């Protein structure tokens, strides 16, 4: 037991965390919650009013990220005023990029930490608490938040709490950071260069989760297919090697990975779609634009034809591959012809649920110095046209699933009905269907009967579990 753990906790309330952004931030927030529960006995609560500690885990990828942080902190002022002993912290990518600004503009904030220093939270909190009892001559110190936005890389993973399952599906961070330096992207400046966790550490986490009942793992990274983890023998394992190892873990029957870069889709990784049945027939592979000219300005270092060739290779192995992507609309210099090339690529590739955004300059990136010469009304029109096409494709794929039998991992009770359970298909569709709670954690076959905007409705197909359920329903009549 650490010195902090051995002392009486200074907190009697709970912990409130608000998370913006990507799945990596969700993973980080989960690890923060477990770390602070272990250190201080803090349990997560639903509202700031219930909390002794309020944490904001931020994202700086999209427009007005900094303003969102200060807007939220403005709303938190009343909670600090009502209970001055509350600890307020800001973490994540905005903290990494704007730490000093936050310290100057938001005196209610006690601690500021980056994505790679969240493991130091307990020590930072202790320092912040100590400042509150500082002598009169140290009053100036009281006005300063404790800040640590450095990049210690792997140290973060070495010092976090043991992984604990929150369900039958789990995120596992295998690498962080980015070394691609696309001209529009702030990630290399907020999360640092790419670094990979050692192979044995990743496997130990997955094996621990499997013993706790996890059936599906989602391998995470800003460029997850750039994973290069050192093995015990000194050799380096790439993502393909890791996937083969994960499939051998008892209890793990479904594997996902996200997010990927087209340049890291190696042949060995593509071969996994033929060799690893546990790997889902779904791939999230951002391209950002269908125009080679725009891709060059973005410094993506690949052409549209290379991207399409990669998808075709995988679809030869998995014809049912579900593809999603990311698109940026209105990048500086984008012409109507460039945008038409994006629409043509989307039409050809047939995307299943994708993300599209209007370009906004991110501070400190090379593209921020370019003239933002695409008028806003034009950006909005292009975005509307792209999203209409993407939504049409997604709806058609959902409708095409009606009448098919899908393998579903049952995750929880349905929010729609107490008689239903909810799970996900390989292409990440939520399916609700009648079934007992005992099915949670099981893979079952479900006949899809109806398609809605955000979910599917189905019927349990004959399995031993389904037969038992149907018998109970019959005798209940």
Swiss-Prot record:
[4Fe-4S] cluster 2 binds at residues 178, 182, 185. GO terms for cellular component: cytosol. Monomer. It comes from Hydrogenovibrio crunogenus (strain DSM 25203 / XCL-2). This is tRNA-2-methylthio-N(6)-dimethylallyladenosine synthase. InterPro entries: Elp3/MiaA/NifB-like_rSAM, Methylthiotransferase, Methylthiotransferase_CS, Methylthiotransferase_N, Methylthiotransferase_N_sf, MiaB_methiolase, rSAM, rSAM_horseshoe. CDD domains: Radical_SAM. SUPFAM superfamilies: Radical SAM enzymes. Catalyzes the methylthiolation of N6-(dimethylallyl)adenosine (i(6)A), leading to the formation of 2-methylthio-N6-(dimethylallyl)adenosine (ms(2)i(6)A) at position 37 in tRNAs that read codons beginning with uridine. Residues 399-462 form the TRAM domain. GO terms for molecular function: 4 iron, 4 sulfur cluster binding; metal ion binding; N6-isopentenyladenosine methylthiotransferase activity. Residues 13-130 form the MTTase N-terminal domain. Pfam families: Radical_SAM (PF04055), TRAM (PF01938), UPF0004 (PF00919). Its main location: cytoplasm. SMART domains: Elp3. It is an enzyme of class 2 (transferase). Binds 2 [4Fe-4S] clusters. One cluster is coordinated with 3 cysteines and an exchangeable S-adenosyl-L-methionine.
């Amino acid at each position: 037991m650490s010195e902090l753990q051995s002392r009486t906790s200074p907190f009697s309330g709970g912990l409130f965390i608000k998370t913006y952004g990507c799945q990596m931030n969700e993973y980080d927030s989960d690890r923060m919650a477990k770390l602070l529960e272990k250190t201080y006995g803090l349990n997560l609560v639903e509202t700031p009013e219930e909390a002794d500690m309020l944490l904001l885990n931020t994202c700086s990828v999209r427009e007005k990220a900094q303003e969102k942080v200060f807007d939220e902190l403005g709303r938190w002022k009343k909670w600090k005023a009502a209970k001055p002993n509350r600890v307020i912290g800001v973490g994540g990518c905005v903290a990494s990029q704007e730490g000093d600004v936050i310290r100057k503009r938001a005196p209610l904030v006690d601690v500021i930490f980056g994505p790679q220093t969240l493991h130091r939270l307990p020590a930072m909190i202790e320092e912040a608490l100590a400042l509150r009892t500082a002598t009169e001559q140290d009053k100036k110190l009281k006005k300063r938040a404790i800040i640590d936005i450095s990049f210690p890389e792997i140290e973060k993973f070495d010092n976090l709490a043991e992984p604990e399952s929150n369900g039958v599906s789990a995120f596992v961070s295998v690498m962080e950071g980015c070394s691609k330096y696309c001209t529009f992207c702030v990630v290399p400046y907020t999360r640092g260069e790419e670094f990979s966790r050692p192979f044995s550490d990743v496997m130990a986490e997955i094996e621990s989760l499997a013993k706790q009942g996890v059936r599906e793992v989602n391998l995470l990274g800003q460029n997850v297919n750039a994973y290069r983890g050192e093995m015990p023998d000194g050799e380096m394992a790439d993502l393909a090697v890791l996937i083969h190892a994960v499939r051998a873990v008892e209890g793990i029957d479904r594997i996902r990975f996200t997010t990927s870069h087209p340049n890291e889709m190696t042949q060995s990784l593509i071969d996994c779609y033929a060799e690893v049945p546990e790997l889902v027939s779904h791939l999230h592979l951002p391209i950002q634009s269908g125009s080679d000219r725009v891709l060059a300005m973005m410094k993506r270092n690949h052409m549209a034809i290379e991207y399409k060739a990669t998808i075709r290779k995988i679809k030869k192995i998995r014809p049912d591959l579900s593809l999603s992507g990311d698109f940026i609309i209105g990048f500086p210099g984008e012409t109507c012809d460039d945008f038409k090339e994006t629409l043509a690529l989307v039409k050809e590739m047939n995307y299943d649920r994708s993300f599209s955004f209007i370009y906004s300059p991110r501070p400190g990136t090379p593209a921020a110095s370019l003239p933002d010469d695409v008028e806003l009304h034009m950006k909005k029109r292009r975005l509307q046209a792209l999203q209409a096409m993407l939504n049409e494709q997604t709806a058609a794929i959902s409708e095409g699933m009606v009448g098919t039998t899908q393998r579903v991992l049952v995750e929880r009770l349905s929010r729609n009905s107490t008689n239903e359970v909810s799970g996900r298909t390989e292409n990440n569709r939520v399916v609700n269907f009648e079934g007992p709670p005992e099915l949670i954690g099981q893979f079952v076959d479900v006949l899809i009967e109806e398609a809605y905007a955000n979910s599917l409705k189905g019927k349990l197909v004959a399995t031993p579990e389904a037969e038992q359920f149907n018998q109970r329903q019959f005798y209940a009549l």
